[in-house]
Amino acid sequence: MIIHPNFDPVAIHLGPLAVRWYGLMYLVGFIAAIVVGRIRLKLPYVAAQGWTAKDIDDMMFYGVLGTVLGGRLGYVLFYKADFYFSHPLDVFKVWEGGMSFHGGFLGVTLAMMLFAWQRKRHWLQVTDFVAPMVPTGLAAGRLGNFINGELWGRVTDPTAPWAMLFPGAMRDDAAWLPKHPALVEKWHLADVFMQYQMLPRHPSQLYEIALEGIALFFVLFLFARKPRPMGAISALFLIGYGLARFTVEFAREPDDFLGLLALGLSMGQWLSLPMIVAGVAMMVWAYRRRAANANAAA
């Protein structure tokens, strides 16, 4: 078994100021997105659409606002609505954590629609340009989760080569044992807990880096190298992220205040299903629209 390094959550100490890893990873993610965007400017069809480096910089401003505001509101509404409705001022305590990708996604989508309206572009043209830039940011964010030792995976077989012990999960591990006697006996987890005071878990943050970050980036980047029907790149992002997140959630520990919901699925899975359906519908619409336009022009 591998023991999580239990990194110091503060990356840089500057006198009384502390730069935390999670915030630093957000910065790295946005910088990586800018780099990917500038690489895309070199594609002939992208240049023909009139995109510029200034457009990317402006989109990042909108993207940051959409990510932070949407991510926070999404967490409040999707995950802990009852608590925050009872403690409304706690909504503003972002330093205590609590961000939702799906909320951030909606926030960024609205921000890009506003950007498109201001630049007099179709909003799908904007999201098609932005979509390949997003996975690098997702990977950076999940790396921040891993460094912080948070959002760990479900308990797994201690003999598995990927099994990892997370010091931050000690309390959850102790509470897990009496609820799963069959697995405790099958995997001899009582002995493991006696020795380490922790249980082996999936490092699901690394799975998310691999699927939602690296794999999704290459799929989108390669797909977007050639001109596609308007909306197709955005659709592929919806499908790709939805499938990746839905899959990884089987190895990720559900939020303790929600647990598993209907059909044994987590909140993350239920929020990903509409993304997949919308992505498939948008992909079909995009290619049918291009075919209809081609027939009309013939």
UniProtKB/Swiss-Prot annotation:
Which Pfam family would be a valid example here? LGT
Q: Which keywords has UniProt assigned to this entry?
A: Cell inner membrane, Cell membrane, Membrane, Transferase, Transmembrane, Transmembrane helix
Q: What is its EC number?
A: 2.5.1.145
Please tell me where a 1,2-diacyl-sn-glycero-3-phospho-(1'-sn-glycerol) binds in this chain.
Answer: R142
> Which GO terms of the cellular component aspect does the record hold?
plasma membrane
Q: Which PROSITE patterns match?
A: LGT (PS01311)
- Molecular function GO labels: phosphatidylglycerol-prolipoprotein diacylglyceryl transferase activity
Q: How does it sit in the membrane?
A: Multi-pass membrane protein
What is the official name of this protein in its record?
Phosphatidylglycerol--prolipoprotein diacylglyceryl transferase
Q: Which domain of life is it from?
A: Bacteria
According to UniProt, this protein's pathway is: Protein modification; lipoprotein biosynthesis (diacylglyceryl transfer)
